[in-house]
Amino acid sequence: MRLQHLADFKPQAATRAWASIPNPNGLPLIATATSDKSVRVYSLNNFTLHSTLEGGHERSVRSAAWKPGVRTDGALTIATGSFDATMGIWRRKEDAGNGNGNDGGDGPLEMEIGADGEVSKGAQLRRGGEEDEDEGDDWEFSIVLEGHDSEIKNVAYSPSGQWLASCSRDKTIWIWEEIGEEGEDEFETVAVLQDHKADVKCVCWRKDDGNGEVLASGSYDDTILLSREDGEGDWETVATLEGHEGTVWNLDWEPEVSMKTESSDESSAPATPRLLSSSADMSIRIWSKVPTPPPQNKPSYFNPGIPSTMRPGPENETWECTATLPKVHDLPIYSISWSKQTGRVVSTGGDGKIAIYEEQTKGRNSVGGTIEKEWVVLTVLEGAHGPYEINHVTWCQRFDNGKKTPDEEMVITTGDDGLTKAWCIEENVEERTLEA
């Protein structure tokens, strides 16, 4: 296997590009956050600029997140987090819902901020809701969310779209909920988590498995925290994962494709997704929840048939590091991504390398008969952005005419050179370590 350069997204940013986030709703669009205070939305069909979000922030846009699902009026939503300590909500009524992704940003626009402008504490309309002449002419900067005291490092919507999380250099994580009717742009702060002891670098949601959606966060304090809502509206930390010896830069939850096992025991409890983490200690770790037997004669916490006053609160969980991927990187690993199609992992970081790993079966344990697996390196590409650091990597579905199968994936990297690059995967190639 090897990575082959497919395309550069045009035009590139004139300054550092931080991260590129594919649209989660199947649209051929990807949003790139940049240091020039804007977000570029590119078409995945032809790797060209689709539209631009600009005029809403006073400093670098560090992170962007698409809201899952599509509103009934067809509007797309992107949340942005900036070094100016604010988060922005952007709307666009999108013709590109037809899936072609080729329009030049001339689709119908959402020009009005809904309702009477009433917003909750912690949120206010930018400049009283007046149209900003400096804003991009295709996306509307609908609302600004304020509360952080310092740079926002990451923003993320929960899989259901109910929650929006932001983390900051101020050591806090804010969780927001959109409470107004569609088009009203009314947000409420539902929690401010303050359990990290240093700069919080990343947040990553796990979908609801019957126990509520879970938020993982990584920090400069070298720890990972897991938090969730207790059913009464309060959020609390349910697990602390310790083991890294440097800043935790990125997290990703295990996709369903890699959770499938060869076990035929249908009576076993559903597996809890594993958590992937990367760090300044140049390691990539996999964390697994330690199973705990259910308490006897005790109702399930989230059983809707039990009155809330009788349900026990969520108990603390124990997690352990169950695997460490082979060492490839020589500098901090800024970004990782776990493929929803193949279960492979891709990583990148300050050394400019891109590495792809795969979990393979070794055999069965002779004692307990359990399946033994190991992670192997499939390929390493060096100097992918020349001498520049790579800040972000993600798996992404291919939409261009060159794809060989409907579900074919590519790798997207975003770097300090302002470039967003697409890489295709060539299987059955012997070379393992290559230079771009």
From Swiss-Prot:
Q: Which GO terms describe its cellular component?
A: cytosolic [4Fe-4S] assembly targeting complex
**GO biological process terms held by the UniProt record:** iron-sulfur cluster assembly
Region Disordered, as annotated, extends over 94-113, 118-137, 295-316
Q: Is the Repeat keyword given for this protein? A: yes
Bias kind Gly residues: ranges:
98-107
| Mapped WD repeat ranges | 10-52, 56-100, 147-186, 195-237, 243-297, 328-367, 389-433
Name of this chain's protein: Probable cytosolic iron-sulfur protein assembly protein 1
Organism this protein belongs to: Botryotinia fuckeliana (strain B05.10) (Noble rot fungus)
Q: What is the lineage of its organism?
A: Eukaryota, Fungi, Dikarya, Ascomycota, Pezizomycotina
